[in-house]
A protein has these predicted regions:
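Conserved donor-binding/catalytic core segment of Leloir-type glycosyltransferases
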Residues: 8, 174-204, 208
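Donor nucleotide-sugar binding/catalytic pocket of nucleotide-sugar-dependent glycosyltransferases
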Residues: 124-170
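Short alpha-helical donor nucleotide-sugar binding micro-motif in glycosyltransferases
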Residues: 130, 231-232, 239-244, 325
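Nucleotide-activated donor-binding/catalytic signature segment of Leloir-type glycosyltransferases, i.e.
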Residues: 217-235
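Short hydrophobic beta-strand element within catalytic cores of glycosyltransferases
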Residues: 269-272
Length: 333
């Protein structure tokens, strides 16, 4: 008889971000191994868009206990710290049920960048949210240490990510352009530090911005030399990775950055700042280059062997990510 995993999330299934991508791939592996996966997300409740950040949904969860009884899960995983995650956490703590959680997003840094909220106010809330979790899954060893530095004292586990190799693979017989092509894939929003990419002045380079978001029209007006191609997924997205000579990752506050390993799987080296996310993902001088001067990182990355970049991406596997997720589930009782 298959066991049921309940994933509690404040993301809708049709959203496109690293968190949703992670769980879709984990779900596929779980189903293959005879697990049943059920989501408790804002779609089950009334919700509104977060002002200024429409991709974030603010739900108003009700009758959580009844929903949990109907689902009857063997394991509960709380993926996000939003209203749905919070309400379920409160119910589980009140009734003595066990669960694990995940820390995917640097909310304290994000809230500071977007709304000016001091991190000293938000880190205690994040720490409190995960306090009773049987296991806290986060992206890398570096993030494990960061959470511990902020007072997390539970069992924290590094949880890797993977790549769909059926979609993200190197170009086959397609000549690269003589003009350097620099591609960035991201939500087009303030906190992503995209100006660092958009303002790059690498001689002769063609810059392509893939993605959508609240700053898109503003950036399109301010940076007419950049090609803004909008939102892309699947094979269409992979085509942009493959056509790039360098994938530029300007963000300084990611916990991981799945787009980097998708680019690597396509044989495209990454240029980034030496900060969390890139430091854990990039093999310096093999799959990418890091430098506080992003233009220099691009220049160095252009010299890398695309075959070695692709080979270096082999360590990222959804099967491995699923094994870590599965092995750190906790029984609800």
């Amino acid at each position: 008889m298959s066991k049921t995993i309940l994933i509690v999330t404040d993301n809708l299934p049709d959203q496109i971000n690293g968190v949703v991508t992670t769980y879709k791939n984990i779900e596929a592996c779980a189903i293959r191994d005879n697990y049943r996966v059920v989501y408790l997300d804002p779609g089950r409740f009334r919700y509104v868009d977060c002002p200024g950040y429409n991709e974030v949904k603010i739900a108003f969860p009700r009758k959580v206990g009844k929903i949990l009884e109907e689902i009857c899960p063997d394991h509960i995983h709380i993926a996000t710290e939003g209203p749905v995650g919070l309400r379920v956490r409160q119910y589980l703590d009140k009734h003595g049920y066990r669960y694990n959680t995940a820390y995917h997003t640097k909310f304290p840094e994000g809230l500071r960048a977007l709304f000016g909220i001091p991190e000293k106010l938000t880190w205690p809330l994040v720490r409190w949210f995960h306090k009773h979790s049987g296991k806290v899954l986060t992206t890398t060893d570096t993030m494990v240490q960061e959470l511990k530095s902020h007072g997390f004292d539970g069992d924290i586990v590094p949880w890797t990510r993977g790549v769909d190799r059926d979609i993200f693979y190197p170009a086959r017989g397609i000549a690269q352009s003589k003009r350097p092509v620099l591609v960035c894939v991201s939500r087009v929003s303030k906190e992503k530090n995209l100006e660092a990419f958009l303002e790059l002045e690498y001689a002769g380079a063609r810059k392509i911005m893939v993605g959508d978001g609240p700053m898109l029209e503003d950036y399109r007006t301010r940076y007419p030399d950049v090609e803004f191609v909008g939102f892309k997924t699947g094979r269409n997205l992979a085509d942009y990775y493959r056509m790039a000579d360098v994938f530029v990752f300007p963000s300084r506050w990611e916990t991981f950055g799945i787009v980097m390993i998708e680019a690597m799987a396509c044989g495209t080296p990454v240029a980034a700042y030496p900060c969390q996310g890139p430091l854990d993902v990039i093999d310096e001088g093999i799959t990418g280059c890091m430098n506080n001067d992003l233009e220099q990182a691009v220049e160095d990355a252009l010299m890398l062997d695309r075959q070695l970049v692709h080979r270096g991406s082999a360590r990222w596997s959804w099967d491995r990510a699923w094994a870590i997720f599965r092995d750190n589930l906790v029984d609800i009782k």
